[in-house]
């Protein structure tokens, strides 16, 4: 009987990428297949996030739930990876003695060896070291599950924002060699991937050697240009970027590379210079707006999303008003916004915080309501227009229909003959938008040339 692995992922796209790699590593080494049901698994892995306290505590809550599974199946192995593993290390085993494996983002490729050591010794294995970027040299070729894929181009972050734990859990910035990234993207394209999302904690800081051991360095703009030249790749996204390193060369890439989508996620974190300084972000609101102004001079319809932290220590009503003014001016399409969560070991954790929790919550609700109004307005403005979408697969709402994604990252559901589904999935097609809903759009095929052939055969 085929053994199975269950992976639960918390947090960012970097973790989603890492989770896929965990499955690939275990499949190549031990023939394990992925399962969506922990009860069916022989190995259960939690890929964790420590950006906020709530996410961190949820991991231990989930661990408590799978403890019963281990009692019923003694051979079951339980592992904790990701940023909580890096931060907590062996203390995870002290708190949850039934955990067998603790590993960091940079050591997931060692999972097969850790599993062997656990079985031989009977003791929990902990490896949260930072071995540069060696994991990419030990990962098997990616297995594709659709026309879009994540590709990690670097690890870590060297910005050390005062509130952020990432540099301590993922290490400083280390870039993959250019040819290594291009080889992975080309391999994905050969398997039918049409859209890649280039991943890093701060992709703007990418400085990859042209090849392993080379002294010549490629910046992020160069990487994008090379990826765009790979046959089969029709769309390029990236996340996350940092305003401080948004160079003119990267801005110019939006004019040079049509395959770079008309959507940008650029975290601002706050709209007050005073708070940005306390966060150690390294830029002012004016400098942030200058980047957007230059980008929209090239791409007037550029869709913009961001991250925002409400209730940072010392935030006044005036600071929050400045944040809201920026939200209105930038017309953000989406925002990942949260109340500030102090993380142990970060400088901001020691700052005095005298803002009541209910005030923070009220501010967050106001911010999110405003963003939702923006989302609804932008979605409604797309009704009646023809959008180019990448067809990703059957619609979640109705498997008899198909779903795809626009450049500004909206899901579009549309009817298509069942017989045409295999031909259309993975294709770029035109869809006329007829209706806008809170979290999706609905449209109809605009049949031209190959699209018409695909839809009728």
UniProtKB/Swiss-Prot annotation:
Q: Indicate where this protein resides in the cell.
A: Cytoplasm
> What is this enzyme's class at the first EC digit?
transferase
Q: Which InterPro entries match?
A: Elp3/MiaA/NifB-like_rSAM, Methylthiotransferase, Methylthiotransferase_CS, Methylthiotransferase_N, Methylthiotransferase_N_sf, MiaB_methiolase, rSAM, rSAM_horseshoe
Main subcellular location: cytoplasm
Required co-factor(s) are: [4Fe-4S] cluster
Keywords carried by this UniProt record: 4Fe-4S, Cytoplasm, Iron, Iron-sulfur, Metal-binding, S-adenosyl-L-methionine, Transferase, tRNA processing
State the Gene Ontology terms under molecular function.
4 iron, 4 sulfur cluster binding; metal ion binding; N6-isopentenyladenosine methylthiotransferase activity
| EC annotation from Swiss-Prot or TrEMBL | 2.8.4.3
What are the TRAM domain coordinates in residue numbering? 380-447
* Binding-site residues for [4Fe-4S] cluster 1, renumbered to this chain: 12, 49, 83
A GO cellular-component term linked to this record: cytosol
**Domain Radical SAM core positions:** 143-377
Q: Which PANTHER family does this entry report, sorted A to Z?
A: CDK5 REGULATORY SUBUNIT-ASSOCIATED PROTEIN 1, MITOCHONDRIAL TRNA METHYLTHIOTRANSFERASE CDK5RAP1
Q: How does it assemble?
A: Monomer.
Q: What is this protein called?
A: tRNA-2-methylthio-N(6)-dimethylallyladenosine synthase
From the UniProt record, report the name of the gene that encodes this protein: miaB
């Amino acid at each position: 009987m085929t053994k199975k692995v269950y992976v639960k992922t918390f947090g960012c796209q970097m973790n989603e990428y890492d989770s896929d790699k965990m499955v690939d590593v275990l499949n190549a080494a031990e023939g394990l297949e992925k399962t969506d049901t922990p009860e069916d698994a022989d190995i259960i892995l939690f890929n964790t996030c420590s950006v906020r306290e709530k996410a961190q505590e949820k991991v231990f809550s989930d661990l408590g739930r799978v403890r019963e599974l281990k009692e019923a199946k003694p051979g079951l192995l339980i592992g904790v990876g990701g940023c909580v593993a890096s931060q907590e290390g062996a203390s995870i085993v002290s708190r949850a003695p039934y955990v067998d494996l603790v590993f960091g983002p940079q050591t997931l490729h060692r999972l097969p060896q850790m599993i062997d050591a656990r079985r031989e010794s009977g003791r929990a294995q902990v490896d949260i070291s930072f071995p540069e970027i060696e994991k990419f040299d030990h990962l098997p070729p990616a297995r594709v599950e659709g026309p879009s894929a994540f590709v990690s181009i670097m690890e870590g972050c060297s910005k050390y924002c005062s509130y952020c734990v990432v540099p301590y859990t993922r290490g400083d910035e280390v870039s993959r060699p250019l040819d290594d990234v291009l080889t992975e993207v080309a391999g994905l394209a050969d398997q039918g991937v049409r859209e890649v999302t280039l991943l890093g904690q701060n992709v703007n800081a990418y400085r990859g050697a042209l090849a392993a051991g080379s002294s010549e360095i490629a910046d992020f703009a160069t990487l994008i240009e090379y990826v765009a030249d790979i046959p089969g790749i029709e769309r390029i996204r990236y996340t996350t970027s940092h305003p401080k390193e948004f160079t003119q060369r990267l801005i110019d890439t939006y004019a040079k590379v049509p395959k770079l989508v008309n959507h940008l996620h650029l975290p601002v974190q706050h709209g007050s210079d005073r708070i940005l300084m306390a966060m150690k972000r390294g830029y002012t609101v004016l400098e942030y707006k200058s980047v957007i102004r230059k980008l929209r001079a090239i791409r007037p319809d550029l869709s913009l999303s961001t991250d925002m932290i409400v209730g940072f220590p010392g935030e006044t009503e005036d600071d929050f008003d400045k944040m809201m003014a920026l939200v209105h001016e930038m017309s953000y399409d989406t925002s990942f916004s949260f109340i500030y969560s102090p993380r142990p070991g970060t400088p901001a954790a020691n700052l005095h915080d005298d803002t009541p929790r209910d005030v923070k919550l009220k501010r967050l609700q106001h911010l999110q309501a405003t963003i939702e109004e923006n989302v609804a307005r932008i979605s409604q403005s797309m009704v009646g227009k023809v959008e180019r979408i990448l067809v990703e697969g059957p619609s979640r709402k109705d498997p008899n229909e198909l779903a795809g994604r626009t450049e500004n990252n909206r899901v579009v559901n549309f009817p298509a003959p069942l017989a045409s589904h295999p031909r259309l999935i993975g294709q770029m097609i035109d869809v006329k938008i007829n209706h806008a809903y809170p979290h999706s759009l609905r449209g109809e095929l605009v049949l031209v040339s190959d699209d018409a052939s695909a839809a009728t055969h």
